[in-house]
Amino acid sequence: MLNGFGETEQRTPRIRKLSYLCFAMKRFILVLWVAAMGWMAMAANPSYPTPKKVEYVYTEASELTLIGKIMDTPNPYHRVDTVKYKGFTKTENFQVRCPAGIAVVFRTNSGSISLKATGDWSWHSNSTMRLASHGFDLYIRQDDGSWRWARNIAPTKDDPETTLTLVKNMAPTMKECLLYLPIYSELTSLQIGVEPGAVLEAGAAPFRHRVAIFGSSFTHGISCSRAGMSYPDQFSRRTGIQMLSLGCSGRCRLQPYFADVLADVEADAYVFDSFSNPDAATIEKRLFPFIERLRAAHPGKPLIFQQTIYREGRTYDTVLDRVEAAKQAMADSLMAIAVERYPDVYYIRPDATSPLHEATVDGTHPDDYGYYLWMCSIEPQLLEILKKYGIE
């Protein structure tokens, strides 16, 4: 090598040894630094592995706090008592016994949570994930009061009884949990299990007021990826206002027997997604009698009707486009009359259409993002109306 005078300098064995020692020392220091950073990271983010075999202690979920129910029922996981209320078709009878929109609120410091569920898991659809139709969807409240998704799970088989490990390896700190129930499976029992010695107690209801919502498959949550992603559920988590869902896929047609149920629902306000399923002729025949029945049952309470959304499947289907346009036009014309004729009746417009027109699963139902857009579009409209009635 060259020295400072441009002359060739021979590296002696001693210099080579010192260079090697310097290199080795630097490498050793680097290894120590990496190890120290690793230990610091582990200290900042400790691990709490769940034991392989846990003898869980179970509590029936109905002994905790159930929210989102429109009325009391003999089976706490049903939405409507189908012994008391008649007129439903076989499909409707099953739908109103499914706990769509119902959630369990509890507090626990358990490092893992197990579920024992008994129910009817027979319904299947290409457009709805099993995690939504059969699954349980867990959120945990953050320090700032917001809800953060934690974990979900669904039975993999249709056996009536199933045991599932919902979540594990959590820190043993107290957590406020919000567990959404399946949108299209009837439950006869749900037990929540925690580790021995852990606390499991009913949580305080996290949402205020009672706003009932009757609607179609959109309100039911069809094509959501998870049970807690319907637009009414997203609205509750975002605003803190409790929505009580009576979404019935394909069956929200302004029927008199559904009006009978809603007449008995004690709520602060009533929202309807009632123009998505019926055709124009049915809307024309049933809308005003439906409004008059509910106004008589709930005088002074707001009745808020939503126009149906644009279905992406109609873009190139000329027949579907004509049908959809006809019922939207009928809803517009009749609701223009209704809001003038009836006090406390309102009409709002949702929008689930993304800029690229891709927020759909099957051309009819939005995906999670589409339902988020729906929720965002009605939020300011609903809040403005609800505020007039002291619902904030």
Protein language model regions, located:
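Serine-esterase "nucleophile elbow" of acetyl-processing enzymes
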Residues: 44, 169-171, 177-252, 256-266
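Histidine-centered active-site loop/cap adjacent to the catalytic His
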Residues: 361-392
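N-terminal secretory targeting modules
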Residues: 15-24, 41-210, 384-392
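Bacterial N-terminal signal peptides
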Residues: 31-38
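Short hydrophobic segments within beta-strands
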Residues: 115, 214-215, 306
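A short helix->loop->beta-strand "cap" motif at the edges of active sites that frequently abuts
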Residues: 298-302
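Substrate-gating cap/lid alpha-helix
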Residues: 311-349, 392
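Oxyanion-hole/transition-state-stabilizing segment in secreted/luminal serine hydrolases
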Residues: 252-293, 297, 308-315
